[in-house]
Design a protein with these regions (language model features):
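Short glycine-enriched loop/turn motifs at secondary-structure junctions
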Residues: 1, 57-60, 99
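N-terminal beta-strand motif that seeds the catalytic metal site of vicinal oxygen chelate
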Residues: 1-16, 64, 121-123
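Short beta->alpha transition motifs characteristic of CBS
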Residues: 5, 99-100, 106, 118-123
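Core segments of cupin and vicinal oxygen chelate
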Residues: 7-47
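Vicinal oxygen chelate
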Residues: 10-13, 66-111
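Long, continuous compositionally biased terminal/linker segments
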Residues: 41-82
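Glycine-rich acetyl-CoA-binding "A-motif" of GNAT/NAT acetyltransferases
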Residues: 114
């Protein structure tokens, strides 16, 4: 039920380089660049935003889950993330504790956030 999500990045360019690639298998692309803020989504609607850090309170990890159309897209997301140097958190697999078709993979983005691609469709 999210309309949009925005995260603050220590290095917007590094985060943009990461998300430019990992969102492709999920159908997401860079939609808008407005100064130092970048919006991603399925055109024409940006629903995931990157911007520079505006608070000096230190890092707080976010968990961001992106919907994947199928399990192949989850695997591609993970492979691209790891190839870009992201820390592997959890390789693609079924997470039966949520439900029988919850297939997800997790990696850490350049700012340390836990990013996930998840598909709920059966194999």
């Amino acid at each position: 039920m999210l309309e949009h999500l925005s995260i603050q990045c220590a290095d917007v360019a590094a985060s943009a380089a990461f998300y430019d690639w990992v969102l492709v298998p999920l159908g997401g692309v860079r939609v808008l660049d407005i100064g130092s803020v970048i919006g991603y989504g399925v055109p024409p609607n940006p629903d995931f935003w990157l911007g520079p850090c505006t608070t000096g309170e230190g890092f707080r990890e976010s968990h961001i889950a992106f919907a994947a159309p199928d399990r192949l897209a989850v695997r591609a997301f993970f492979d691209i993330a790891v190839a870009s140097g992201a820390e592997r958190l959890h390789a693609p697999r079924v997470w039966p504790e949520y439900h029988a078709n919850n297939f997800g993979a997790f990696a850490r983005d350049p700012d340390g956030n836990n990013v996930e691609a998840v598909c709920h469709a059966p194999e």
